[in-house]
């Protein structure tokens, strides 16, 4: 049997590998060695008691079993950089509390950023690090201004599901990201994710794809490995309220719009010469189909409620 307690006041996390029990398993050790890039671990305590043949001292339900032994690790890590998955931006300036009990690893944080997207809360769990198919499950919330969110998207696998529409997108204004990641430790390229981005009065445009400036955007964009969607979104276009819905279809992203067309709308886009000859208002609908480097816009209206005068052949009453 072994009865060991190690206390490490301060240590560079890249050097903690000297203290990892080999019984953690090849998959877990590889992830620890390649993912913890830098940082300072403080007040690290490692306790191992029992026969190492029974490590990590859990029962059949993967619960700590004191009759078998004890394995616990606690540590507070500050200023760290962590590479949690291939192709994803690193977590930087990351302060995190680490707790290991039996075969379960728990990570908690409220400090750090991902490409300047400020972390509000972070929790990660590896339920059983001894399994060959061990997973790290992460729940993450960030305060993300839209320009910083777009930068993160364009430097992550989420860019693929955006069908080429995010690359030249410009954005500003507040928002919040909720993201769940499931990371197989033996293949960090095979991450599954699902998330949502809350527009809290943001603005965006994509001149390359003829998407005009949308301001005061409010709504919830939902996305995963395969799709994106937004229902019942709201925005302002040319000083007029607008309803928005977004979905993916085949190799394109489709944005459906509906709004009100009146003289103010026309003045904003075409000038007073046109708007002075328009009275009333009418509803209109539009569909903007966006794909990599291409866009297609279809607009329609029945003109009910609108009168157009003194415009040659366009007179309508």
Question: Which residues make up each language-model segment?
Answer:
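Transmembrane beta-barrel architecture of outer membranes
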Residues: 3, 91-95, 121, 214-218, ...
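Extended amphipathic, helix-rich lipid-handling scaffolds
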Residues: 3-68, 72-82, 129-192, 196-205, ...
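Solvent-exposed loop/turn tips at the surfaces of repeat/solenoid architectures
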Residues: 11, 78-80, 117, 202, ...
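Short, surface-exposed charged micro-motifs
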Residues: 45, 95-97, 111, 123, ...
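Solvent-exposed loop/turn segments connecting transmembrane beta-strands
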Residues: 86-90, 115-118, 208-213, 237-241, ...
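Surface loops and adjacent helix of pleckstrin homology
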Residues: 87, 110, 209, 233, ...
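Structural motif
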Residues: 101-103, 224, 249, 291
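Repeated loop/turn-to-beta-strand initiation elements of outer-membrane beta-barrel proteins
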Residues: 104-108, 227-230
């Amino acid at each position: 049997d072994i009865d060991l307690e190690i206390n490490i006041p301060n240590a560079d996390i890249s050097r903690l590998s000297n203290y990892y029990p080999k019984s953690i398993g090849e998959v877990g050790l590889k992830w620890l060695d390649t993912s913890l890039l830098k940082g300072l671990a403080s007040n690290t305590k490692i306790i191992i008691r029992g026969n190492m043949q029974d490590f990590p001292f859990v029962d059949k339900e993967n619960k700590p079993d004191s009759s078998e032994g004890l394995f616990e690790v606690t540590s507070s890590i500050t200023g760290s950089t962590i590479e949690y998955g291939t192709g994803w931006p690193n977590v930087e300036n990351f302060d995190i509390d680490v707790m290991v009990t039996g075969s379960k690893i728990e990570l908690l944080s409220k400090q750090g950023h991902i490409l300047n997207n400020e972390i509000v809360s972070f929790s990660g769990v590896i339920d059983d690090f001894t399994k060959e198919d061990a997973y790290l499950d992460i729940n993450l919330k960030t305060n993300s201004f839209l320009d910083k969110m777009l930068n993160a998207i364009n430097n992550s696998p989420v860019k693929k599901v955006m069908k080429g529409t995010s690359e030249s997108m410009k954005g500003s204004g507040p928002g919040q990201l909720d993201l769940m990641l499931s990371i197989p430790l033996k293949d960090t390229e095979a991450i599954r994710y699902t998330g949502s981005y809350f527009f809290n009065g943001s603005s965006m445009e994509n001149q390359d794809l003829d998407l005009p400036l949308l301001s005061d955007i409010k709504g919830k964009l939902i996305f995963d490995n395969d799709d994106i969607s937004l229902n019942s979104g709201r925005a302002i276009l040319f000083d007029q309220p607008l309803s928005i819905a977004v979905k993916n279809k085949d190799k394109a992203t489709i944005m459906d719009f509906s709004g009100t067309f009146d003289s103010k709308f026309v003045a904003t886009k075409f000038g007073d010469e046109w708007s002075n000859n328009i009275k009333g208002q009418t509803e209109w609908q539009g569909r903007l189909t966006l794909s990599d480097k291409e866009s297609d816009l279809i607009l329609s209206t029945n003109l009910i409620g609108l009168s157009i005068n003194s415009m040659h052949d366009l007179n309508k009453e």
